[in-house]
Amino acid sequence: MNAIAAEAGITKPILYRHFGDKGGLYAALAKRHTDALLDSLRAALDAPAERRERVEATLDTYLAAIEARPQVYRFLMHPAEGSPGDQGFDVGKHSAPLLRRMGEELAQVIEERLDLGPGSQQLARVWGHGIVGMMHAAGDWWLGERPCSRAELVRGLADLLWGRLAAAGDKVGGPGF
């Protein structure tokens, strides 16, 4: 909280007066950044391009967002390691709903756009949450280690997803995936 107040150019008491505690600050940042990220991901999915290009653009949008603001990403997704002042703050309790929200949003897009056959609603949720989990885990690993370029990671993740996404037909009357 000291670093956040200093970066904002205010005192810590003013920060606490506005947000109450770290949980209040977390909730405000989480909403703001998740809303912006989801808007960007929707734009990538809706771009006038071939399906494979949109898949890659969506993956790249997520990775670009966490790369552009790594401190915000770490604050939202990871506890401050070894910081005694943060012992009562459970980031996992707060970050799980963010990932769940992203998974449900992606599941809705998949359900609306792809013909997955019988059980499509459940399968869309499996895919939505699975893809979000993959993006989160791979992005977290990549941001911490930088073992390859962002473009290489995007291609690798898209290759992993592509088999079944390429085979699924668009839903009749839907906007297409």
Q: Where do the model's predicted regions map?
A:
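Hydrophobic alpha-helical connector segments
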Residues: 28, 43-71, 154
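Helix-turn-helix
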Residues: 1-24, 28
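Amphipathic alpha-helical packing segments from all-alpha helical-bundle domains
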Residues: 86-115, 122-133, 137, 152-163
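Alpha-helical DNA-contacting segments of helix-turn-helix folds
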Residues: 19, 26-33, 76, 95-98
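Long amphipathic alpha-helical segments
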Residues: 144-148, 168-177
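Short, hydrophobic secondary-structure boundary micro-motifs
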Residues: 74-77, 85, 119, 151, ...
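Secondary-structure edge/capping motif, primarily at the C-terminal ends of alpha-helices
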Residues: 41-48, 76-84, 138-146
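Generic hydrophobic, amphipathic alpha-helix propensity
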Residues: 4, 29-33, 37, 41, ...
